[in-house]
Amino acid sequence: MVSLVNSSLTCSSLTLNLLPILRTETPSLSRKRRAAYVAATSSRDVNDTAADSSQKLTKFVTFLGKGGSGKTTAAVFAAQHYALAGLSTCLVIHNQDPSAEFLLGSKIGTSPTLINDNLSVIRLETTKMLLEPLKQLKQADARLNMTQGVLEGVVGEELGVLPGMDSIFSMLELERLVGFFRQATRKNHKGKPFDVIIYDGISTEETLRMIGLSSKTRLYAKYLRSLAEKTDLGRLTSPSIMRFVDESMNINSNKSPFDGMTSPAMWDTLERFLETGASAWRDPERFRSFLVMDPNNPMSVKAALRYWGCTVQAGSHVSGAFAISSSHLTSQIPKADFVPLPFASASVPFTITGLDWDKILLDQANSSIRELLSETVSHGTSLTQTVMFDTAKKLVTLFMPGFEKSEIKLYQYRGGSELLIEAGDQRRVIHLPSQIQGKVGGAKFVDRSLIVTMR
């Protein structure tokens, strides 16, 4: 492990090209004028989104922050905004908190509930989600007879949820909605893919694990392949297991990516499959995450900074930061702490009778958050480089916001071809270019960045 030394570094600023979005001329804008304006805005946004491809890809948006910081409020705000802009939007709730129902003024079920023509909402429940994969396994087993009828006797409705199942099954359901690995199979009420999926998960920690799932699974797959190909037990059992997986994925007319392949080809395909998934979380055109904080709560602000660094460690990026308040701000928003992220704020006043989303969305005080949401879903923003290589000086610069130097550990394995960074209960592997591969000569922590010197 290399010790870290303090110094200073200036972060580059972020350049934005803001889009025209919904604005209000007066608080009393008539519904007819509002509808016409929204229609024009919607047309621009949807056309911009689809301009570069004939097959529109579903965007995935989520929010990260401390519990009670306003993640659910931000998710509902974003869902209402995108729906108002004419984008087919699905808000996915994966918790039992009734807050979303209050914010929407509607009950949420385990199948999509239509709030309006552009907005659907669904609550994920793991007890329901585990039934469909079990059904597919049973159908595959009926063809292959691997368990000799034992699997057929399993009653899915009596199975409880074990730790870890929530993240696994939510990822499977989100794959159907978004299509990280293959084309999305779950459609809106018009039979078309959704334009935007807004996800409000169980917790920020669970969401971060989900974000890093594909990249982290690749190393496990590598070791499993070695076990399958180099041991007697692996050579005996892996062909049957791989065939079972192949058959299960072919159920319901979904052609398996492993269809008809040999075991080595299936492992190669799995590696490419996982890389496709990992690249989707890195792609600003597909994935957006926003930090959410209560500006009146210093702990909420500190947590947002930490989750920024944790997202980088998970192998993804943060697109912006939101300050959500139910009343007027009583403290100064710490925008400087989040440079170079774009920062926006919104006030969502609660009443006993519910929320008037037309009034909230068209409030000029909330224009900055609408601008940021529209910008990121339509064109994306310039993102801070989290890893930079200087081959001339043999330097590796790792942007690690939210961490102190004592919280970062640096390791090196595999003959100097990569670095292993541990921070925020996440491990990240940095593959080094051939020009700077070698042993670590030193490291220092400089204004939210770890600068490693190679020799």
Curated annotation (Swiss-Prot):
* Compartment(s): Plastid, Chloroplast; Plastid, Chloroplast, Plastoglobule
Hydrolase is among the record's keywords: yes
One GO biological-process annotation of the entry reads: protein transmembrane transport
> Does the keyword Isomerase belong to this entry?
no
A matching Pfam family: ArsA_HSP20
Q: What class of enzyme is it?
A: hydrolase
Q: Which GO terms describe its molecular function?
A: ATP binding; hydrolase activity; identical protein binding; protein homodimerization activity; protein-transporting ATPase activity
Transit peptide residues are: 1-34
| Primary location class | plastid
Q: Which UniProt keywords apply?
A: ATP-binding, Chloroplast, Hydrolase, Nucleotide-binding, Plastid, Transit peptide
Subunit info? Homodimer.
Which family would the database say this protein is a member of? Belongs to the arsA ATPase family.
This protein is called ATPase GET3D, chloroplastic
Q: Please give the organism.
A: Arabidopsis thaliana
